[in-house]
Every structure is written in C-alpha cells, then in structure tokens.
C-alpha cells in the first residue's frame, strides 16, 4: 500500500538511522587534485550507536580528518526524529542514515539528499527475527498473524522482512509491526507483549544469549549484501561546501579500508559510543564496510521500497550519489 506524501514525510523524518580479518595498512591520502582547503572546517556529524558508525571515529582518532583540515564533533542520535530538523537548521552538517530512510526523505520532499559515502552492507547474522526459545513459532511461515517488534515502521527492518516473508507466501499486511526500541525488545518478548522481534547487532547476540533464538536471518537471499546505511548531507549543503564534502569522503574512505581489514581497529572505537565491550566487538557478526560508493548497489534498496509500497514512484539513486574523489 502506497502512503500519501504527508505520511511519508513524517516517516522519513522519524526514520531510524540505522544499521551492520586482520592487519591492513592504511595507504594514506591520495596525492594531488586538491585546490584550496575546505569551505567549512568544523563539522557536526550525526552518528548512531551501532558498529556502522565506526569509520567516522576511526578517521577522527587516526587523524584522517585533521589531515584534511577538518575538526569533527560527533553527536550520537538517540531520537531519530530529531535528525532532519538539525540538518535543515544547520546545527548538524552530515549524518548517517539507513538507505531506506535516505530514499524516503528524498521521495517525500522533506529534503534533497546527497549520499557522500557508503557505510555498511548486510552480511548473514547481523540482523534477523528472533523469538523466545519456548515460542511455538518454528519458521518464517509461522509469522503469519504474529505481532513483530521493530525499531521503526516503514524502514529497513519492515522492508527486509517483507522481502523474505514474500518467499513464504506471507504478505506484509498479514503480520502486525509495532514500534519497540531495540533496548526494550527483549523485555517485550519475555513479557509476551510481542511474538517476535527484528533485531540488529549487538542486540541480536545479546538476546540469543538471554534465551531467544533466531527464526529468520534477514540478510540472506533477497537481501544478501544489501546496502544498509551511508553518510549523507543535503543537496544545498553539498553545493555550498563541495571541498568540505570531498575532504570528508577522503577521510572516511581511508577509515573504511581499515575497518574492512582489521577487526581490532573496530574494537578500539565501537565501545567509545556504544555499550558494546571490546571483546564482544571482536566476536560479533559484522556487516561489510564498502570502500566504494556504488549507485547500482544502493538502487536495490530503492527498488525494494517501491515494490513494497514505500514510495509513490521509483527513485533514481544515481542522482543522489556524490562520487568519491579519485574514483
């Protein structure tokens, strides 16, 4: 069912900023091609308390932003609905959002979005539907008629579940999605306020350790390697600060290369802005950190959104992407 523009704008504003080997050496910044410094040197960046925000913290701690002439302040977003007002009034420059959220914002007209860098792509084990061990639900088909907790409606969780349930002949309107914050989902399951919950890491591992079991991995099959989230700014901001945007992209690219090759680098920073301990970061399931920005990959998200009625019309993701300098 396709929702109206006003409703979709509200959904976009409240959408969740989601979601997520050893020893690679950083090759350093690319030589040449830089004329003048960044137009704006002090940036406020909105991050979510999930592993996919790690590259910004890596870039900051390793001095990559400093080398690009940038000083970065991070703001952990606990209430997703506060993000777009900050972006639109200029108190936040760049933010991380799920691609479902970013495409929704673009389609709703709430803002024109430019994607600066990919953040995380899906991998098996990082998100899925869980039930308590004693639940009568034994497989995805059993979710028909179930009440499922999600962190946000019309976002990554509901869309990825819809793609999987379709294969089991369960339509989205045959389940009931209810909003429960990730932190409260396990309690909702234990108290039987919901039948199942869609969780992401690190909540997924914690729930399984506390007596829940995985019923459906939502990062396989139709959503295998699906792009999850990325760093974005408004079209207006990017047009006014092209050198700043490019500097941010270069710094994050270097951090992404470290994140994809060395789990220990991630373990250094994730505990700084989440409640996940270092040893858990070393062992938990993790998505992949793309080192390129590919519109074709992200288009998969927009196409799934259109298929399941999240969009009024198809969105061309290529028009939203800002090529990474040097690529």
Predicted region positions:
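Bacterial N-terminal signal peptides that target proteins for export
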Residues: 1-11
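Short, glycine-/small- and polar/acidic-enriched structural segments
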Residues: 28-170, 179, 195-198, 214-217, ...
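Pocket-lining segment of extracytoplasmic ligand-binding domains
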Residues: 100, 109, 178, 183-269
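Conserved C-terminal helix/tail region of periplasmic/extracytoplasmic solute-binding proteins
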Residues: 305-327
